[in-house]
């Protein structure tokens, strides 16, 4: 646990230190990301400018996993055609769940911002992959697009990526929340930590979100994806938490 905290701190401080090299863009993007948590452009730019240390970490996570290596090699893209395919899937599939999330929020994959501040091609793809699977993650864990729900997802993604934008989004979003919603952040953090990536003997396997072939599961039952990935959706986590049935094995 202590090593994870140290590693997270290193990635956060490394990202901020690296951002100083692009000071004007950093100041502009960080102001937009913190003052308005719904400022997509500001958040996207801030995420990239502060990402370098975390991106190297994310690349290592992918290279250490067979599916992650395959994703880095093939470099799949989440496109509007991906969503169209998902729309054709029957109820009960992950594709149906993803398409429903996108419809509720009037989203298109093509609406995601391009990568503008990461020069290394491989790291740029890692950042793009993270950005493109964000809606898959929302659909998987069962969280919508309110500020409270978005911050919960950011806490979860922080555990999987170490990107500084996750913590900064939480700091920037807090003033927009009611007191009861602020108190919920502790619960969301508990859920996020319980679902951090791990492949330890005797412990519950949890895949890193970067190493999940989300597109492959679009025509598969949602339950199959949950079983394979090991991440406990929030509603299931809360039920287990209430019943005292949470465990790591």
Curated annotation (Swiss-Prot):
- HAMAP family the record matches: Coq4
To which pathway does this protein belong? Cofactor biosynthesis; ubiquinone biosynthesis
- Can you say what this protein is called? Ubiquinone biosynthesis protein COQ4 homolog, mitochondrial
Q: Where in the cell is it found?
A: Mitochondrion inner membrane
Q: Which family does it belong to?
A: Belongs to the COQ4 family.
Q: List the disulfide bonds.
A: none
GO (cellular component) term, any one: extrinsic component of mitochondrial inner membrane
Which reaction does this chain catalyze?
Answer: a 4-hydroxy-3-methoxy-5-(all-trans-polyprenyl)benzoate + H(+) = a 2-methoxy-6-(all-trans-polyprenyl)phenol + CO2
Source taxonomy lineage? Eukaryota, Discoba, Euglenozoa, Kinetoplastea, Metakinetoplastina
Is ATP-binding one of the keywords?
Answer: no
Gene source species: Trypanosoma brucei brucei (strain 927/4 GUTat10.1)
GO BP: ubiquinone biosynthetic process
According to its UniProt entry, the function of this protein is described as: Lyase that catalyzes the C1-decarboxylation of 4-hydroxy-3-methoxy-5-(all-trans-polyprenyl)benzoic acid into 2-methoxy-6-(all-trans-polyprenyl)phenol during ubiquinone biosynthesis.
* Note in the entry: This protein may be expected to contain an N-terminal transit peptide but none has been predicted.
Quaternary structure note: Component of a multi-subunit COQ enzyme complex.
Q: Which UniProt keywords apply?
A: Lyase, Membrane, Metal-binding, Mitochondrion, Mitochondrion inner membrane, Ubiquinone biosynthesis, Zinc
* Chain residues that bind Zn(2+): 134-135, 138, 150
Enzyme Commission (EC) number: 4.1.1.130
